[in-house]
Regions:
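Gly-rich Lys/Arg/Thr-decorated short loops/hinges at beta-loop-alpha junctions or inter-strand turns
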Residues: 113-121, 226-238, 273-279, 348
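Active-site His/acidic residue clusters
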Residues: 158-164, 233-237, 257-297
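Metal-dependent active-site segment of extracytoplasmic phospho-/sulfohydrolases and closely related
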Residues: 63, 291-328
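N-terminal catalytic scaffold of extracellular/periplasmic and nuclease hydrolases
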Residues: 20-195, 200-218, 223, 317-376
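Active-site regions of oxyanion-processing enzymes, predominantly non-cytosolic
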Residues: 214, 218-228, 248-270
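Structural motif
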Residues: 55, 189, 227-229, 264-268, ...
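Sec-dependent signal peptide recognition
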Residues: 2-10
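Hydrophobic h-region of N-terminal signal peptides that target proteins for export
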Residues: 10-18
């Protein structure tokens, strides 16, 4: 009942926004810039930390995108989670006496999620002074856990990069690839071969890695895996993506869950965000179908591995998506922008330690708590 009530609060909040979103888009306010000051009250843990963590990030996905999926695809896999909360995503970018920002990008929010630290837009796991900050993937490696990154974008894109690299600007994907090649991450799967020249692949392989370009390639269980299945990001779902997020997640878990010390894997459904930037309901619908399949796979896995914590959230919302009735019973999906918004995003969790996320929180609280679990 509590989970249902929390969902109702989320939906009610979004309904109010949807009704007045178009008008608000055009209204110029004179609010004095301030950063929010909230005493976040995350619960204490149940006393049992998870052995392993599956951290799913659906890029650019707010309540509007889930509403599109619910009505257009007839699916809402997150309803299977035990706990649900709400997340603020603003970056630390600018002085609030003059020009602070409420709208994050995937680099700043990725760093908040990976390291529990606020930073400026564009920063990849560095603080506002451009000093590296330690990520949960690096903490997991230090604690002897197997580690993995999966994305439907380039693997060097902002969100996955924020877990395994440190650069001052997100567009330095070639440099991020160079860092990944020597980072000893056990599994890296996604797109972006163009940032991995043969010389860099050789460096990776000489350090005990196996490069694959076909998801069906037999992998050596004694080697780390780098799978790059497209030159750039993977193909859109509605255009016939050949390698699904769930296929990559399955391959990752088959190789990570052999580690007796547990594993950490971040899996990004990257392109819901791109559908928001494109103002394409069809794009969003396809990527949300992929997300639903991924969530079902992860929760099915967790049901037979009860020591695994599964967390699903977003780095930010994109497009200011709202759903209305269209003609002849179809959906009228409206956008208030072609960029990110400051709208809160949901978080869901199931498994040991999941109940702490049944709250309103800043995105840094997610990173901090998951790092605490890894350190225990």
């Amino acid at each position: 009942m509590k989970r249902i009530m929390n969902l109702m609060v989320l939906i009610s909040f979004w309904g109010c926004y949807s009704m007045y979103g178009a008008a608000l888009q055009e209204e110029k306010t004179n609010f004095i810039p301030t950063q929010p000051h909230v005493n976040y009250q995350l619960k204490t843990t149940e006393g049992v930390a998870p052995k392993s963590i599956i951290f799913i990030i659906s890029d650019g996905t707010g309540i509007g995108q889930y509403t599109v999926s619910y009505y257009a695809n007839g699916e809402f896999a997150p309803a299977r989670f035990d706990h649900v909360g709400l997340v603020a995503t603003h970056p630390n970018d600018g002085e609030c006496s003059t020009s602070c920002k409420r709208v994050t990008d995937s680099a700043a929010s990725g760093t908040a999620l990976s390291a529990g630290r606020k930073t400026y837009n564009g920063a990849i796991a560095v603080d506002v002074d451009k000093n590296p900050v330690k990520t949960m993937l690096e903490w997991a490696q230090e604690n002897g856990m197997a580690t993995g990154l999966v994305a439907t974008s380039t693997v060097t894109h902002a969100t996955p990069a924020s877990f395994g690299a440190h650069v001052d600007y997100r567009k330095k994907e070639a440099e991020i690839a160079e860092q990944f090649a020597i980072a000893d991450i056990d599994v890296i799967l996604g797109g972006g071969k163009k940032f991995w020249p043969d010389s860099l692949i050789s460096i990776y392989e000489n350090r005990g890695g196996q490069f694959i370009s076909d998801i069906n390639t037999t992998v050596d269980s004694n080697k780390r895996i780098l799978g790059l299945f497209s030159d750039s990001g993977l193909e859109k779902v509605h255009n016939g993506r050949e390698v699904s997020t769930t296929q990559m997640a399955k391959l990752a878990l088959e190789n990570l869950d052999k580690d007796p010390d547990g594993f950490f894997v971040m899996i990004e459904e990257s392109q819901v965000d791109w559908g928001g930037h494109s103002n394409s309901a069809e794009y969003i619908k396809g990527e949300m179908k992929s997300l639903n399949d991924l969530v079902n796979f992860a929760l099915d896995y967790q049901s037979t591995h009860p020591d695994v914590l599964v967390v699903l959230t977003a780095d930010h919302e994109c497009g200011g998506v709202a759903v209305h009735d269209g003609n002849n019973g179809d959906l009228d999906v409206r956008f208030t922008s072609d960029y990110h918004s400051a709208n809160f995003v949901p978080i869901w969790a199931t498994g040991p330690g999941a109940s702490v996320f049944d709250a309103f929180m800043d995105n840094t609280e997610i990173g901090k708590r998951l790092i605490e679990y890894i350190q225990e």
